[in-house]
Amino acid sequence: MLKITELTGGYGDKTIVKGVSFEVPKGKMLGILGPNGSGKSTMMKLISGVLPAKSGMVEIEGRAISEFGAKELAKKMAVLPQLHAHAFAHTVRETVSLGRYPHQSGWFASWSHEDEAAVAEALRLMDIQQYEHTPIDQLSGGEQQRVFVAQALAQNAKILLLDEPTNHLDINHQRELLDTIKRQAIEKDLTIISIFHDINLASMYCDQLLLLDKGHVMRIGEPHEVVREQDIERVYQARVSNHPHPELPKPQITLLPGVERPRSASAIRAEDFSISAEMVLYESDVPLKTVSSAVINAGAGWYRTFINRHVDMDYNIDDSLSEMTRFIEERGFKPTDTVGMMTAIKTEHVIIKEFPSSFGSVVIAVTAGVGNAVDVSKAIERPLGVGTINTWILVNGALSDEAFIQAMITATEAKTKALHQEGVKDPLTGTIATGTSTDSCLVAATQQGAILPYAGPITELGGLIGSGVYQCTIEAIALYRKAKMQ
Ligand SMILES: Nc1ncnc2c1ncn2[C@@H]1O[C@H](COP(=O)(O)OP(=O)(O)OP(=O)(O)O)[C@@H](O)[C@H]1O
């Protein structure tokens, strides 16, 4: 275990690191974050003893590092420095072998089996055996970086201090290196402190993070306690947005540009929709921020093409994703820029309406096939046939994440109310239907103009969505019923 208490130090009269305290238990990895010049490397130098501290303590398992001899300390602690000016005249194997120096004794050091095994293991872990006899200066920056990490690993110390270990590495080698280091920490009970410039990598791999600001600890804790928008923005002086990692409970940030997106003169208009026998199509000049439960590109994203495609009643293709992607490509659209839904009802039965407001307008488009309507409170009791109400809400305005979700809720409530009003029943239970079995909803916004933080019924936007979806759904049901009667 490594314990740092009130560590203070710097260069000459210049105090860089000011009263830093923390502990890292065995088997854990602490990531150091902070902007350029905040004192990260200086702190590492103080911890490793390369730079004497002005005050404070660094203890390894309860013993101050000042009590260790140089070789004894090197057996406990391996350091990957930020710059590797040394050793460029050596081969890869020779460079990695230098990591074994604390384990050599006497003037005529004897190279043991243990030394050989440690070097071989380090070469293997960093996947650099193939360069074993290559002079280091003939390797790429990323390959060299792996050699220096191998040198630190060959030292077989229980504490690893790494200054930007992923420097120069491509994304796969970043992952491989950090996976290896993390695995080593767990399997060999290593204590690891590592400096990171990449906040997202640090969040993904570290158990604890320390955010350094002008030599002070601004925040320390688990990644979710440290990777917070306001703190990161203040310390790094950059606009960021925080979002969840898709697979791990580790927050990630996205850098936001200082330069604004050029404003588009065009807005979403109902008359710009086109309706053919194949599809209802809306093509936007600018990408719209979209949240949907579509077939293609469901979830959140930015898209310019919106398709509600007509398919036969008996459309039943196992891989509808591939089939729909092909359909989009064959029509000259880009699947990466398109949200696509399907409906069995005729596209001419779509209802598209524009609702003006004080902030801009909302365009709503609904197709409603209610032959297989469902009372959702009884859905679990029996199998369901396919049926679809597709609801699109396109907003000329800038929605918050909250507003996107509220818009979905408001739209769903309005749809259900319309079914109730029209007396649409679940054919299997005879009770009032709440929707159909495969309804889709889409909310998209220009993200320009008025900022719309909410979209519940209490807001103007929510009110428009509520009455708009209600009206459109009622009219769409009427068209559907009329067509069925004929
Ligand atoms: N050898 C030195 N002598 C005098 N001042 C130094 C020395 N090394 C670093 N400094 C100063 O100490 C401050 C902190 O530097 P340090 O290298 O610790 O920052 P850092 O957080 O690691 O930055 P970076 O992200 O750029 O690597 C800087 O203002 C730097 O100019």
Predicted regions and their residues:
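Conserved ABC ATPase "signature" region
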Residues: 97, 113-131
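Helix-to-loop junction immediately C-terminal to a conserved catalytic motif
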Residues: 48
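Alpha/propeptide regions of enzymes that mature by internal proteolysis
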Residues: 262-486
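The feature captures the beta-strand-to-loop junction immediately N-terminal to the Walker
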Residues: 33-35
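Conserved ABC transporter NBD signature motif
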Residues: 56-64, 73
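ABC ATPase nucleotide-binding domains
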Residues: 237-270
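Catalytic Walker B motif of ABC-type/P-loop ATPase nucleotide-binding domains
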Residues: 160-164
